[in-house]
Regions:
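Coupling and communication elements adjacent to P-loop NTPase active sites across diverse families
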Residues: 1-70, 81
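ABC ATP-binding cassette signature C-motif
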Residues: 52-245
């Protein structure tokens, strides 16, 4: 009798476990269906990149970056041409974000040669979105973009209208990143510099961003660790080596 009770208990546990697994599988199927439905319904994101008159818009020759007296990036040679998507790749602390900021004109010490094409219009997405605050219309006006267009793009990135009534500081990390991405998509630029654009971004929005880049082929310089994303957009990689004097 004791054995039968034990076997019955084990059978009940196995049935319960099987039910949980089945429920999880069903949930995954429903989520996939919802994602596909969203993709079918969603309007495509649009971008209107500019083409610079120079074929090469960025060129670095034997470029080294410094934090104070410490060299953090070894001699680096690369260029970005019109219509190219280039990803800087390297370990944390190797100066990838600093390289982007140096190209943007920030006062970061360097040695070597860095050429930025004259008259180059750049649209920048920062790695850090935590500092964002205020209402979305105020943010748009401050950044010099059309509030209506910004909100239309955010709606395509799965924002509800109710979200626009809340201050940006109350948004999740992913929502804040979407605000920066949508702001960049509002801007006509020769070069789009995006620092870790996929941070906190959901799969649905990620697919839209990949398709956008595949369709419009904007000139881009990115920092992004996700290899699959790089492959999807056909990016060329530039390796940054960490060095210290």
């Amino acid at each position: 009798a004791g054995d039968r009770g034990y076997i019955g208990h084990q059978a009940a546990r196995m049935m319960k476990r099987a039910l949980v697994i089945e429920q999880r599988a069903q949930k995954a199927v429903e989520e996939k269906k919802k994602l596909l439905k969203n993709l079918e319904k969603a309007e495509e994101l649009k971008l209107f990149p500019l083409k610079h008159h120079r074929e090469t818009v960025i060129r670095a020759e034997n470029l080294e970056l410094f934090y104070g007296e410490k060299k953090v990036t070894g001699p680096l040679n690369f260029e970005v041409k019109n219509g190219e998507q280039v990803i800087l790749r390297g370990k944390n602390g190797c100066g990838k974000s600093s390289m982007l900021k140096r190209i943007l004109g920030e006062a970061i010490s360097y040695r070597g040669k860095l050429e930025v094409a004259s008259g180059l219009e750049i649209s920048y997405v920062s790695q850090d979105a935590e500092q964002l605050c205020g209402m979305i219309d105020e943010f748009a006006i401050k950044e010099g973009v059309d509030p209506t267009l910004l909100k239309a793009l955010l709606r395509k990135l799965d924002f509800s209208r109710v979200q626009f009534e809340k201050p940006i500081e109350s948004y999740s990390g992913g929502q804040k990143k979407k605000v920066l991405l949508a702001k960049s998509l509002c801007e006509q630029a020769h070069l789009y510099i995006w620092d870790e654009p996929l941070n906190f971004i959901d799969l649905f929005s990620r697919i839209q961003i990949e398709e956008l880049i595949q369709t419009y082929r904007p000139t881009m310089l990115l920092v992004e660790h996700d290899r699959f994303f790089g492959e999807k957009i056909g990016a060329r990689y530039v390796e940054i080596q960490c060095t210290q004097d």
